[in-house]
Design a protein with these regions (language model features):
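Short amphipathic alpha-helical interaction segments
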Residues: 118-132
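A cross-kingdom feature that marks ATP-driven nucleic-acid transaction machinery
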Residues: 128-129, 134-136, 140-288
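Conserved phosphate/pyrophosphate-binding and hydrolysis machinery centered on Walker-type P-loop NTPases
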Residues: 34, 58-66, 85-89, 102, ...
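Interdomain motor-coupling "hinge/lid" segment immediately C-terminal to the ATP-binding subdomain
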Residues: 2-3, 7-101, 105
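Generic structural marker for isolated residues within well-ordered, non-membrane alpha-helices
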Residues: 11, 109, 191
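A short alpha-helical element within helix-turn-helix/winged-helix DNA-binding domains
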Residues: 106, 111-116
Length: 288
C-alpha cells in the first residue's frame, strides 16, 4: 500500500483523547467538556497550518516546506502514475493547487477544469484520483423529499489542512489566519475532526450539508438513529444568528419520511461550552 494513504491523525488522537464519534448530544458535549483539555485558541491556526501528518507532529524539527515538497513530489511521481495514467505531471500539480482553493467550498467542476485547461470530465476523474489517494473527500448534499430547493453539488475538503496550506503557498500560521482563506480552512479543520472521529471508530461518517437556492446553508448534518443533528461552523466568538438557519430544516420532521431534529450548535471560537437555547450550544472548536 502507498504511504500516501496513511490516515492523517485527528487532534484528539494527538492529545490521546478517548476515541468516540462526534454526535453533538448535550450529554456528550457536557461530558467531553469536563474530561478534556481544550485546544487553546492561540494554537488553533498553528495546528491548522501545521496539518495532521504524523511525521510532522512527532518531529518538530522536521521542516514543513521540505516535508510537503517531498510528499507532493512522491505523490506526483508514484501514486498519480499508478492511479491516473497522467502524462503531464506539471498539469496535474496545477490541478492539485487549484483544487486546494476549493477546500470547504461547493465544487464547480467546470470552473475548476477551466482554471487548469482540462475538460470537466477530466477534472472529475482527477478528483476521484485525489479521493482514492485519501487527499480529499466529498461532503454530499443532504437530500429529503420535503426539502425541495436543495443544491445538488458536493463540497470538497482536503483531509490535511497543512497540505492545502502548502499548495496555496501560505508560508505561516499567522498569514493563513489573517488571509482570505481563513474561514475555509477553519471549516475544513472542523469538518475533518468530526469526519475522522467516525473513521477512527470504524464507522462510515454519516455527514452531509444542506444549502438551498437562497444560499442559506447548514454546514454539517450528522444523521444517526433517525435523528439529524445540525451544526453551523463560524470563525467568530459568538455567532448569534447562526442557529436561526436551522429553521430551514423544519420540513424534514413532517410526513412519511420524518426525521427528528436533534440538538446541535455552532462550532466557533467561543472559549466555553455555552447554551444558545434549549437545544443548541456554542461549541468551542477546541472541544472537537
Amino acid at each position: 500500500g502507498s504511504e500516501m494513504c496513511i490516515r492523517d491523525r485527528s487532534y484528539g488522537e494527538l492529545i490521546d483523547r478517548p476515541a468516540g464519534s462526534f454526535v453533538p448530544k448535550s450529554e456528550f458535549l457536557l461530558q467531553r467538556n469536563q474530561d478534556s483539555p481544550l485546544l487553546p485558541m492561540s494554537d488553533l491556526f498553528d495546528q491548522i497550518w501545521q496539518g495532521s501528518m504524523p511525521a510532522l507532529n512527532s518531529a518538530p524539527e522536521q521542516d514543513w516546506n521540505c516535508y510537503y515538497s517531498s510528499y507532493v513530489q512522491t505523490f506526483l511521481q508514484r501514486d498519480v502514475k499508478e492511479l491516473a495514467q497522467v502524462n503531464d505531471e506539471l498539469q496535474f500539480y496545477r490541478f492539485l493547487c487549484a483544487a486546494a482553493n476549493y477546500t470547504g467550498s461547493m465544487l464547480n467542476y467546470a470552473a475548476l477544469a477551466k482554471e487548469v485547461e482540462i475538460t470537466p470530465p477530466t477534472a472529475k476523474q482527477w478528483l476521484k484520483v485525489l479521493a482514492a489517494a485519501g487527499l480529499v473527500y466529498f461532503l454530499e448534499p443532504f437530500a429529503h423529499p420535503n426539502l425541495k430547493y436543495a443544491v445538488k453539488a458536493p463540497k470538497l475538503y482536503f483531509t490535511d489542512t497543512g497540505l492545502a496550506a502548502y499548495l496555496l503557498r501560505w508560508s505561516s500560521a499567522a498569514t493563513l489566519e489573517a488571509g482570505a482563506m481563513a474561514s475555509n480552512f477553519f471549516e475544513t479543520w472542523v469538518v475533518n475532526e468530526i469526519y475522522k472521529s467516525f473513521i477512527n471508530c470504524g464507522q462510515i461518517p454519516p455527514l452531509s450539508y444542506f444549502r438551498d437556492f437562497n444560499t442559506k446553508e447548514v454546514e454539517l448534518l450528522i444523521e444517526t438513529d433517525g435523528c439529524v443533528y445540525p451544526l453551523a461552523i463560524r470563525k467568530s466568538a459568538q455567532p448569534v444568528k447562526e442557529i436561526k438557519k436551522f429553521e430551514i430544516l423544519k420540513p424534514i420532521a413532517e410526513g412519511e419520511k420524518a426525521l427528528r431534529i436533534g440538538s446541535g450548535g455552532v462550532v466557533c471560537l467561543a472559549n466555553d461550552l455555552l447554551p444558545v437555547d434549549a437545544k443548541n450550544w456554542y461549541i468551542p472548536v477546541g472541544l472537537l
